[in-house]
């Protein structure tokens, strides 16, 4: 009997694994505004959220790829923005150079993001300057224009990144 209990105990201890649940993070993000004007990314006039940056050599610089955050002209809240400022705050893997590689092998490469028609033209988005301002009236006309440019580091490989933005109208 003792032997049966001992064998049962050994068998149970071998099959009992860790019962610890997986941990994770949840991010909550929102904005409170009296006026809303939803924007959609557009690349070469086509709605989309993937910007193809092309291929660059190590330490090379890619072409500037233009894109805009634009609202449909028939969206109700956008019409009341003509005298306001739109502050766009970017978040993601921001460094002092730009957006860092998040999933590719070219880990010392980055994307330089600059305004085209912001209140400060050519303003770079980086960790110390993640908010850029635009005349809000541009939301339904030309949109809030940017360029994205891949800057190659020393390590060859693929580059993958993502960024989020939030718009506050003042």
Swiss-Prot record:
Please list the disulfide bridges. 37-78
> Which UniProt keyword terms apply here?
Disulfide bond, Fimbrium, Signal
Q: Where in the cell is it found?
A: Fimbrium
Q: Main location per UniProt? A: other
The region annotated as signal peptide is 1-21
CC per GO annotation: pilus
Which is a GO BP term held by this UniProt record?
Answer: cell adhesion
Which family, according to UniProt? Belongs to the fimbrial protein family.
What the protein does comes down to: Fimbriae (also called pili), polar filaments radiating from the surface of the bacterium to a length of 0.5-1.5 micrometers and numbering 100-300 per cell, enable bacteria to colonize the epithelium of specific host organs.
What is this protein's record name?
Answer: F107 fimbrial protein
Q: What organism, scientifically named, is this protein from?
A: Escherichia coli
Q: Which gene encodes it?
A: fedA
